[in-house]
Amino acid sequence: MSSVTTPAPVYTWTADEAIKFLKEWNFSLGIILLFITVILQFGYTSRSMFVYVIKMIILWLMWPLTIILTIFNCVYALNNVYLGFSIVFTIVAIIMWIVYFVNSIRLFIRTGSWWSFNPETNNLMCIDMKGRMYVRPIIEDYHTLTVTIIRGHLYMQGIKLGTGYSLSDLPAYVTVAKVSHLLTYKRGFLDKIGDTSGFAVYVKSKVGNYRLPSTQKGSGMDTALLRNNI
């Protein structure tokens, strides 16, 4: 006696159900999107480091979420055309994520800073202040960099780095580390404002795949490779 297999019912989402779903989740989705928009809009290192870190976490999570969604589309493709596009998008997303990790690891080897895994930029400005290396991300490699000291507080490109410094502590060179090379900036102008404030302008002087000798005497290390990063 042969048995007949009953096909599984195909569930279709009606327009009324879609409208009901949007009505139920519209408020929550709006709050989430507003939160992400505010973080992406105002997340800058010169404004709030805490907000900027949250922004970096959101950007970093975009890659695995994208890969998960593209794989999901491959498994539940509507037809062969959708399947083909989903496979291509999955491969592209995975390759780009691998490239990101490779570049980040190369930059980490050069700088020793966890800022190397910043998903927004591969440019890290480095300044050696009395043997302590400060590393912070910048969007692009500018032709000039400005270092400011206001009553002992150290700022570089508007980003606060530390306290307890004077103009005499500023180095002759600062660097911007990239994945494949290092940019050296030479101090071209120094101006003192009052007793404890002033600024210095550094101009790009060299670009190449080399390392700048450390200002620490007897350390034998390179400026862009010091491990005591802040």
Curated annotation (Swiss-Prot):
Keywords: Glycoprotein, Host Golgi apparatus, Host membrane, Host-virus interaction, Membrane, Transmembrane, Transmembrane helix, Viral envelope protein, Viral immunoevasion, Viral matrix protein, Virion. Belongs to the betacoronaviruses M protein family. The chain crosses the membrane at residues 25-45, 56-76, 85-105. It comes from the Viruses. GO terms for molecular function: structural constituent of virion. It is a multi-pass membrane protein. The lineage of its organism: Viruses, Riboviria, Orthornavirae, Pisuviricota, Pisoniviricetes. GO terms for cellular component: host cell Golgi membrane; membrane; viral envelope; virion membrane. Component of the viral envelope that plays a central role in virus morphogenesis and assembly via its interactions with other viral proteins. It is found in: Virion membrane; Host Golgi apparatus membrane. Coiled coil: none annotated. The keyword Transcription does not apply. This is Membrane protein. Residues 1-24, 77-84 are virion surface. Homomultimer. Interacts with envelope E protein in the budding compartment of the host cell, which is located between endoplasmic reticulum and the Golgi complex. Forms a complex with HE and S proteins. Interacts with nucleocapsid N protein. This interaction probably participates in RNA packaging into the virus. The gene is M. Residues 46-55, 106-228 are intravirion.
